[in-house]
Amino acid sequence: MAQELKLGYKASAEQFGPRELVELAVLAEQHGMDSVAVSDHFQPWRHNGGHAPFSLAWMTAVGERTERVQIGTSVMTPTFRYNPAVIAQAFATMGCLYPGRIMLGVGSGEALNEIATGFQGEWPEFKERFARLRESVRLMRELWLGDRVDFEGEYFTTRGASIYDVPEGGIPVYIAAGGPVVARYAGRAGDGFICTSGKGMELYTEKLLPAVAEGAAKAERDVADIDKMIEIKISYDTDPEAALENTRFWAPLSLTPEQKHSIEDPIEMEAAADALPIEQVAKRWIVASDPDDAVEQVKAYVDAGLNHLVFHAPGHDQRRFLELFERDLAPRLRALG
């Protein structure tokens, strides 16, 4: 059965402090969003004006203040500064508190967050980071069965470990992928798949989504059962100049993947990002002041097969964005589903 079209809100933990970020999630539910997803950074991508509240504390606060939205990370790295057994316990607890509403979105990690918190040695290449991710997911799922777990992995070990409070069925795990290797893994092992917009439609139509389908087929799964989430970078405002200028804070998104994965210091990240021209920064975003134009650009992702659209707005006035989204974009987007 095909997944229904869902509209979500990206809570930008790099841009807002914890109390404001909770209030924005509450507003997102009030404005009709189906989900709220939060980034999980120890350090932001900007030193000046940046924030980095702890995602799990935020999720619990949002759970207490909301009634229906799905709440999750997009994304967390459960492999370096975190012990995946403890992450499994934390998410199981939230799953008991807010049944059916919690998801865990995971990725392979960035040096910015892990080296500051004590990772020693050379930052690992993709092969090791991916192996750690797979092993952590396997361990967390074993723990969510509620049994005593003796786990002997290459990177993680448990001895008679049990999680005593686990929601029935465990916690859905969403795998973030920027290329076909991890996308195949998402199809094979993920309850959901996460990607981000603005990288050329052929990436989604020719690489990522076919890889998800290939992974699902190899695991004898129905790819239609996998929630296909995309973070859509959208700067929508009825004022065209504001729509363009609002992207400036998020210039780090326009750095190369190598820069984003290897830069260790937010001051260095900020300097590299601020050297970029606004035109290059804006290329990662749907920048629009006409609602039909905005929805037409989003529609391409729906047509590609992505069903869970999580909207990341770059401006500081998120209340305005949520009001405009509900008024101008949501009705048009719902009609696509």
Swiss-Prot record:
UniProt-annotated binding residues for substrate: 196, 199, 260, 284
A Gene Ontology biological process term: carbohydrate metabolic process
What residues does coenzyme F420-(gamma-Glu)n bind to? 40, 77, 108-109, 113, 178-179, 181-182
Q: Which controlled-vocabulary keywords does the entry list?
A: Carbohydrate metabolism, Oxidoreductase
Top-level division of the source organism's lineage: Bacteria
Q: Which InterPro entries match?
A: F420-dep_G6P_DH, F420-G6PD/mer, F420_G6P_DH-rel, Luciferase-like_dom, Luciferase-like_sf
As for what it does, the entry says:
Catalyzes the coenzyme F420-dependent oxidation of glucose 6-phosphate (G6P) to 6-phosphogluconolactone.
Identification of the protein by name: F420-dependent glucose-6-phosphate dehydrogenase
From which organism does this entry originate? Rhodococcus erythropolis (strain PR4 / NBRC 100887)
Q: What does the organism's lineage look like at the top?
A: Bacteria, Bacillati, Actinomycetota, Actinomycetes, Mycobacteriales
